Structures are given as C-alpha cells and as structure tokens.
C-alpha cells in the first residue's frame, strides 16, 4: 500500500486554495509547517500537529480548510538564506555532564537547545551543570530549554529547577516543537542581532510556531 497519490492530491488542493504559508499534507490532513513533526516511521499517520489543530482535512465534501488557524501574511515573501549552522540539540539523560556546554562553545556553537525533563527541569542539585550553563550564556551563547515531551509545552517558572535556569539566562521554548525551535534559533542567530533583540524575536509569534497565549505569558512576565 502507498499513500503518495492521496498525499499529492491533498497537497495540490491546499496549494490551489491560495492560503499563504508552508504546510504539510499527509494522511488526509494538512498541518501548519511550523507545527509539523514526524512521530512514527511506517504508519500512514506518521506526522502530527504539535500543540496546534490541523489546519485542513479531507472529508466527503473535499478539503475542509480551517482558515482561522492559518496565520495571515505579515508582508511580502522574502527568501531568507542567512542561517546560523552552529546550533546544537541535546537531550538530557541521568548523569549528564555540564562540561559539554563549554566544549560546544569552544567548537564555535552559538546556539544550544536542551531537551530537559518534564516541564523543563535541569538537574542542579549536587552538580555543576547550572554553573557550566551560566558560564556559556555569559560568553554569548543562546540557550533554549524545552521539554522532552512533545505535547503541552514547558513552563520553567513552575518549579525551582526551571526558575534557576531562567535566572541563568536561558530562553524557554513554551509550546514550540523541537523542529520549530531549532529552525527559529538558526534564523535568529543568522541576523546577528544583540541579545535583547534576539530574546524579543524568539518569543514573538512569527509564523504560528508559538501559541498566542504562550506569547502573552512572556510579555506579562509570568
């Protein structure tokens, strides 16, 4: 069995709708590109929309587009080619050694995404992980913490370990997917902005990658 024909048909219908944006058409569903993530290797429902509704679906009437979930254009289309390739992704495991942060900094990495535990917890008791993390941030590295759980996002202000990380200067991914965070950091660092501008743009909803209420939490200081 193959689903290529059905996926192509769905993609063509979406392209013909005139809706702006980047989308993924798969298994009779359309996913906003900034929310798409591959979660299975062989199943027909291999892709899911992370923390966001599907923006389209094939039913008996054809392609049903949920226009209210599609972000409107914010200007003319511009092809961005300046991406920072020195961005690294780490998943925390028990026994993790924070010295890897310094190693990555010495190798020229400018951005680091850490997939932490639960709500975004980074072990800080009886370890030097937080000191190592704070050191590379002070040297200019941009560090983002997100949950290893793909759904429901992270809130570092909820527990002490998360608040300690925030005090060290990390950004939190809120409800963004891993793919969206990595891409966003590469794009932002390619701009060579100052840290204040980088932080502002990281928490700004650019293409539907972060939920509006999550964006509001940042600006309200929650």
Where are these regions (language model features)?
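Short, glycine-/small-residue-rich phosphate/pyrophosphate-handling segment
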Residues: 1-28, 32-37
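C-terminal non-catalytic interaction/assembly regions of soluble proteins
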Residues: 119-222
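Conserved active-site and cofactor/substrate-binding residues in soluble primary-metabolism enzymes
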Residues: 2-6, 50, 99, 107, ...
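Accessory alpha-helical/coil subdomains and C-terminal extensions
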Residues: 32-119, 124-126, 205-222
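Short coil/turn connectors at secondary-structure junctions
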Residues: 17-21, 26-27, 52, 83-87, ...
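Hydrophobic helix-cap positions at the C-terminus of alpha-helices
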Residues: 14-15, 104, 136
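Short beta-strand segments
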Residues: 23-27, 91, 115, 146-147
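Short, hinge-like loop/turn segments at secondary-structure boundaries
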Residues: 4-9, 40-41, 160-164
